[in-house]
């Protein structure tokens, strides 16, 4: 968007482009999904006899009506999974705050690259977490009943996908398309 000032001088005003706004919405959704994934009580469930989250593991013997719960922070792979997911969530939070601040001030372009880099780093951390979790779960915990990865695990994948989408949108060069808006 260009406007003329005092006849001959032209000033460029940085407008918020729709793709950056959609990127900000993607980052916000990723943040919300990450919070849901971290707080979820159901990453793995098995026929109302076993529940595993990032924080605790609960099992109920078939003959009993009471659940026995233990902390999952005793094994290395579960601590690593939690650390990778929380690290990615922290980077998503930081990139959301930087992107939000960049919307409020005039010089937005200089914040696009750091936001995209933080989001790509969050995607790498969370993808490592989401690949590590089922591999180590199947390797270390032997359930003789049908089990499935539940909605908490799915929320974490959703957060990773939205983070990747936001990172792609923040990588797009606004110089190529901002004259059309």
From Swiss-Prot:
**So what does this one do?**
Regulates cell junction organization in epithelial cells.
Pfam families attached to this UniProt entry? PMP22_Claudin
Which UniProt keywords are given for this protein, alphabetically ordered? Cell junction, Membrane, Transmembrane, Transmembrane helix
| Topology in the lipid bilayer | Multi-pass membrane protein
Q: Quick one: where is this thing mainly located?
A: membrane
Q: Does the keyword Calcium apply?
A: no
User: Where does the sequence pass through the membrane?
Assistant: 21-41, 81-101, 115-135, 152-172
Name the record gives this protein: Transmembrane protein 47
InterPro entries found in the cross-reference section: P53_induced, PMP22/EMP/MP20/Claudin
Q: Which family does it belong to?
A: Belongs to the TMEM47 family.
Concerning Gene3D superfamilies, the annotation shows: 1.20.140.150
Q: Where in the cell is it found?
A: Membrane; Cell junction, Adherens junction
One biological process term from GO is: cell-cell adhesion
State the GO CC annotations. Answer: adherens junction; cell-cell junction; membrane
Q: What is the lineage of its organism?
A: Eukaryota, Metazoa, Chordata, Craniata, Vertebrata
| Gene name of this polypeptide | tmem47
Q: Does the keyword Transmembrane helix apply?
A: yes
